[in-house]
Regions:
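Face-selective signature of the C-terminal outer-membrane beta-barrel domain
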Residues: 1-157, 246-248, 295-318
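Transmembrane beta-strands of outer-membrane beta-barrel pores
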Residues: 8, 24-30, 89-93, 138-140, ...
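C-terminal beta-signal and adjacent terminal beta-strands/loops
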Residues: 384-463
Length: 463
């Protein structure tokens, strides 16, 4: 990642500023998996298919590269009013290459490249946006109104594999509004509304058909539309030198939510599955669709307590209720809890020790629920040479080598439970050294680039 901001303040009008920003971001990922089959003990019902079964080697790489250019202008009008405007251009290139290699099952021969089932997919997403905002400050009251226009250009190409190239353009108008009331010099109350657009990431879009498990296939959907989410929130904050707290209640809804959908289907209903890959039986097929209606009610709190000049305790708590409804009568609802907390202690001679704990309950999905999660870490830091040299040691999840994840999905005619475990024990050391003297603090630009429009998660369509 990298970026640069240029900001110019008016020498005559306080609060008037002009900012130019550029940011580049890239997120490469690779995967390498082998699926080898022992066909000697297959059930008689699967004999015909097992004779055609082949070992698989899947070599995959996904990457998203963003270039963002942004210009912002802010100016006061009198003592009470502020006008903001700006333009933004995002050039987002998604790429996904999945190469498949095959050999006869239970054979030690070399793998051979399978061009028919390999895919090289490109998805270019250009976003042109402009916004206009108005701000008001009058006594204890403050308010903001804003509107943003976005024009999106999508260009999809298949360099290798099945799929038709396509290009589409669409427009969105995104409003926002907020109202604040200053209760005291240290506390505030705020009411707000905003609309958010979440574009599917490469994991959701990847069209590669993963059939390494012949009874459970998965595939992304390159024709997904962006989610449009509406949210209302009410928050209270109070900040003192000793104690800080922020409490927020939030309600949000989405009518075209991107959801993972698993169905028990005939293999003839999977267009990218060739005849020689079919088992002759119904199979589970997972993909993503814009079918979900999501309703979320959340309550969150952040607390920071400076117990002494050397001791700090902090916590971030979240509780929410989610209701999901999709096509074909699919629906699910439930509660989700999240907690993050820790403490930091400073000792003599610039020794600092911190401990953090994180946990969450299973998250709600349209057809089931995901896994709970628990993690913890310790960090020890020591400064030397008038804080020029810093040494840090950290350890996380040191009592348990693996973290186990469990998910439960059910639909018409099937129930699927899966268990996975991943290494989670971490140890590390870091060293930093500051060269030169910092005579004054470096000022940051008041405006900079933030891109948070990509929906995270996904992965069923990739190896």
């Amino acid at each position: 990642d990298g970026g640069i901001d240029y900001q110019r303040l008016s020498p005559t009008i306080k609060g008037r500023m002009f900012t130019l920003s550029y940011k580049v971001n890239t997120r490469p990922q690779t995967s390498d998996s082998y699926s080898e089959y022992d066909i000697a003990y297959g059930h008689d019902d699967w004999t015909d298919y097992l004779r055609r079964l082949q070992d698989q080697h899947n070599d995959g790489s996904q990457n998203t590269t963003e270039h963002t250019f942004q210009a912002d202008y802010t100016t006061p009008i009198g003592k009470l009013h502020t006008i903001e405007s700006g333009v933004k251009y995002i050039l987002r290139n998604n790429s996904s290459d999945n190469d498949r290699y095959l050999r006869t099952a239970a054979d030690n021969s070399d793998y051979v490249f399978d061009e028919e089932y390999s895919t090289h997919y490109r998805h270019q997403n250009d976003i042109i946006a402009a916004y206009l905002g108005y701000g008001l400050k009058w006594k204890k009251l403050s308010g903001r109104l804003g509107v943003r226009y976005e024009h999106t250009i999508e260009d999809v190409k298949y360099l290798l594999g099945r799929g038709d190239d396509f290009r589409k353009n669409y427009d969105d108008v995104v409003p926002s509004a907020s109202l604040g009331w200053k209760l005291t010099d240290l506390s505030n109350l705020r009411l707000g509304y905003n609309m958010r657009i979440y574009r599917p990431g490469i994991w959701y879009l990847n069209p590669y058909l993963n059939d390494s498990n012949p009874s459970s296939l998965s595939q992304g959907n390159p024709e997904l539309d962006s989610e449009k989410s509406h949210a209302f929130d009410l928050s209270y904050s109070n900040f003192t030198p000793k104690f800080n707290i922020n409490v927020s209640a939030r309600y949000s809804f989405t009518n075209n939510s991107i959801q993972s959908v698993t169905s028990l289907v005939s293999e003839d209903d999977i267009p990218d599955l060739s005849e020689d890959k079919k088992t002759g039986k119904d199979v589970l097929y997972t993909t993503y669709q814009n079918i979900g209606k999501s309703r979320n009610l959340n309550l969150s709190a952040y607390v920071n307590w400076n117990a002494t000049k050397d001791t700090r305790v902090y916590a971030n708590l979240f509780g929410g209720y989610t209701s999901l409804k999709g096509a074909n009568g699919l629906e699910n609802d439930g509660w989700n809890l999240f907690a993050y907390g820790g403490a930091q202690q400073t000792f003599k001679h610039d020794w600092r020790l911190s401990m953090n704990i994180f946990g969450q309950t299973p998250w709600i999905m349209l057809q089931g629920k995901g896994s709970s999660f628990f993690s913890y870490s310790l960090n020890l830091n020591k400064s030397f040479m008038n804080r020029r040299l810093s040494l840090s040691a950290f350890a996380s999840n040191f009592f348990q080598k693996y973290n186990k994840f469990k998910s439960h999905i059910e639909g018409q005619g099937f129930i699927q439970d899966s268990w996975n475990k991943y290494p989670q024990m971490r140890f590390g050391l870091s060293v930093s050294y500051r060269i030169g003297e910092l005579k004054a603090s470096v000022k940051k630009a008041a405006r900079t680039i933030t891109n948070d429009d990509v929906k995270s998660g996904g992965g069923s369509g990739a190896t």
